[in-house]
């Protein structure tokens, strides 16, 4: 009987083999996952709360069963009784392994919180809000002139040129408000025809939120709807990550676990509601002042948010339940918000090209309509748009999670302590690197790694490492290691060769042969998707290459060009546009006219499905090469590929 069990941690993506009876805190520490534990694991500080996932997790190849961890202890039962918010959670120091597990470490339990970067650079947005405020002085009723309270209010609005209706849910509070304010009201009117909130007359600040629902990260931007000023922003890990690290894993979870779709929906709605509550608290405002929320996300995130099963999107022909712009009130989704807060979701384009891509398109629409422009959001499913001479084509390409550090032997998501930059001297093969959270390079005096070892390598780091290895001739053009260049830096892990990148004793960081293959497959898939669009539009160059998303913002243009992720690209044409989806969502929140702009623009986009394209395989094979390497392909060696589970 094997007493070693696989324990996988989210959101970091770290995996480790723990022994039967080990506490989850011990395993986390061995895996380099930093969980808060001031008492050292003696059950005294009560800070190491974690959540044990359940069901089949195909991404990790793990099936979680409630009996794979020891029973809830008396201490935990008492703490949960005292604070019901702990229900469903466990103390890592009190929970012992009895089988394979997937463990979610919530943000409040992380010693080094996940590095989340989806901040919006300052933008100059046009403002034409859907919400307008009107001051109304209601005339006192008499026996001779005694209209209803609602008629009185509507008449006052009509005098100001507004013909509106009043929402039924406001009627119960209208007369008490009229009496308490002596008939002096400020009224919020949506789309110039519907009263959605009433307040005592005065100066009121009305807010709106733009939300980017990423598969990994949720980003919120809150604006003053009058002047368009950004007043608050926040981001958080998408709590769905505990059900599957990538999109297809979450679809698989829904397919294999009864009620799985409801759990995914509840998780994301709950987190978004929490973020909006925090925003209102931070702004010291009431919920009825947050009246508009615009959301974007990929098709699977869209469907799950609305409680629509994503299963159809897990298999061809990837049929959407709905594509169009969608408006719903908070009460229709049973969200714990002001009932008439309107939640608006951008239109989807088709298949796996979603509302986030549509929003990114809106944010860059001027340049895309004037120049030959490639817009790429690199993620587990790359979304690609190409514009030329007024035509816009779009596709998605299954790059997998390697670019985000997953499926890499020492890979982690972007978290503090993760290697994000790598340089290798071509002559000495000396490695220099930077980690997230420290501005200094590893060979500089003020480098702070004496306090914290590198926890792994994230997506930008693995890209730079592989390019640097290829430039130094340590990887040949086919992607195989050239071990004869520096045999002392190579070792074996089973049947796989690995290169020592950072020597940290038993916590050393390696690049394995299968890691190179994972990046090779990812870059070939993305490159093939771009090539297909170039083929359709008879395009042989780009005026601009726009990298969207938080990951794109961290990529060095030189390394993107050298890795041949994008055909014919040169570093000077590559520009990071940051969280373009968040920028587009913000633009549509603040200017009602932008909504019609993107609704009409999306209808003209031609969607190409790579899965059915006969030339995809041809382009894919061509893109496998590492042209930056000076070493041509060596004698063929069979390379073991890590089994990818979908």
State each model region's role.
Residues 239-282, 407, 416-424, 518, ...:
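N-terminal phosphate-binding loop and adjacent alpha-helix
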Residues 297-312, 387, 539, 550-569, ...:
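Short glycine/threonine-rich loop-to-helix capping motif typified by GTGT followed
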Residues 34-66, 73-74, 81-100:
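Local cysteine-cluster metal-coordination motifs and their immediate loop/turn environment
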Residues 335-336, 348-363, 520-524, 574-611:
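Glycine-rich phosphate-binding/hydrolytic loop that grips phosphoryl groups
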Residues 470-537:
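A contiguous, well-structured pocket-lining segment that forms one wall/lid of small-molecule binding clefts
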Residues 211-215, 220-248, 311-325, 359, ...:
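Glycine-rich phosphate-binding loop of actin/hexokinase-like ATP-binding domains
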Residues 3-5, 77-210, 215, 264-269, ...:
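Nucleotide/phosphate-binding catalytic cleft detector across ATP-hydrolyzing
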Residues 388, 393, 531, 535-602:
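Catalytic phosphate/nucleotide-handling subdomain of diverse soluble enzymes
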């Amino acid at each position: 009987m094997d007493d070693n069990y696989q324990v996988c941690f989210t959101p970091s993506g770290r995996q480790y083999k723990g022994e039967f009876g080990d506490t989850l805190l011990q395993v986390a520490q061995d895996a380099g996952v930093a969980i808060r534990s001031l008492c050292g694991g003696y059950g005294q500080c009560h800070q190491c709360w974690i959540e044990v996932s359940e069901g089949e997790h195909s991404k990790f190849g793990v099936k979680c069963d409630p009996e794979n961890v020891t029973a809830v202890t008396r201490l935990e039962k008492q703490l949960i009784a005292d604070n019901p918010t702990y229900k469903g959670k466990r103390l890592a120091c009190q929970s012992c392994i009895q089988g394979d597990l997937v463990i979610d470490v919530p943000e409040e339990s992380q010693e080094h919180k996940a590095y989340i970067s989806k901040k919006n650079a300052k933008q100059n947005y046009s403002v034409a809000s859907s919400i307008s405020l009107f001051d109304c002085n209601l005339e006192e009723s008499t026996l001779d002139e005694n209209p209803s309270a609602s008629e009185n209010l509507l008449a006052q609005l009509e005098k100001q040129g507004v013909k509106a209706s009043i929402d039924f849910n406001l009627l119960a509070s209208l007369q008490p408000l009229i009496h308490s304010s002596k008939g002096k009201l400020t009224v919020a009117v949506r789309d110039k025809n519907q009263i959605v909130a009433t307040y005592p007359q005065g100066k009121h600040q009305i807010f709106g939120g733009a939300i980017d629902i990423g598969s990994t990260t949720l980003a919120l931007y809150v604006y003053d709807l009058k002047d368009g000023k950004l007043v608050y922003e926040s981001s958080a890990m998408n709590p769905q990550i505990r059900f599957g690290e990538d999109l297809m894993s979450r679809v698989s979870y829904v397919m294999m676990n009864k009620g799985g779709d409801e759990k995914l929906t509840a998780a994301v709605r709950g987190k978004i509601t929490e973020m909006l509550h925090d925003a209102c608290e931070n702004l010291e405002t009431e919920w009825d002042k947050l009246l508009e929320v615009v959301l974007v996300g990929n098709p699977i995130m869209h469907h799950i948010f609305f409680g629509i099963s994503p299963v159809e999107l897990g298999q061809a022909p990837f049929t959407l339940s709905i594509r169009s712009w969608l408006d719903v009130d908070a009460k229709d989704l049973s969200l714990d918000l002001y009932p008439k807060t309107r939640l608006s979701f951008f239109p989807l384009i088709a298949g796996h090209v979603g509302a986030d891509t549509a929003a990114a398109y809106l944010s860059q629409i001027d340049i895309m309509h004037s120049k030959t422009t490639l817009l790429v959001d690199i993620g587990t499913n790359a979304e690609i748009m190409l514009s030329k001479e007024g035509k816009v084509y779009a596709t998605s390409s299954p790059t997998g999670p390697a670019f985000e550090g997953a499926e890499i032997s020492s890979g982690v998501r972007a978290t503090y302590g993760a290697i994000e930059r790598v340089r290798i001297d071509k002559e000495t093969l000396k490695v220099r690197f930077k980690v997230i959270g420290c501005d200094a390079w590893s060979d500089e005096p003020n480098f702070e790694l004496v306090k914290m070892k590198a926890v792994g390598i994230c997506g930008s780091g693995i890209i730079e490492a592989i390019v640097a290895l290829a430039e130094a001739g340590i990887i040949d053009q086919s992607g195989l290691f050239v071990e004869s260049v520096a045999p002392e830096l190579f070792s074996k892990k089973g049947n796989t060769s690995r290169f020592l990148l950072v020597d940290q004793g038993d916590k050393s960081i390696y690049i394995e042969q299968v890691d190179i293959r994972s990046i090779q497959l990812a870059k070939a898939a993305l490159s093939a998707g771009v090539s297909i669009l170039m083929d359709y539009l008879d395009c042989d160059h780009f005026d601009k290459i726009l990298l969207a998303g938080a990951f794109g913002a961290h990529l060095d243009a030189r390394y993107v060009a050298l890795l041949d992720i994008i055909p014919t690209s040169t570093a000077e044409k590559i520009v990071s546009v940051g969280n373009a989806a968040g920028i587009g969502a913000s633009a549509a929140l603040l200017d009602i006219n932008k909504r019609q702009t993107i609704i009409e623009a999306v209808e003209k986009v031609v969607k190409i499905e790579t899965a059915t394209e006969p030339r995809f395989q041809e382009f894919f094979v061509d893109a496998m090469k590492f042209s930056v390497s000076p070493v041509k392909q060596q004698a063929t060696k069979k390379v073991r590929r890590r089994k990818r589970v979908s």
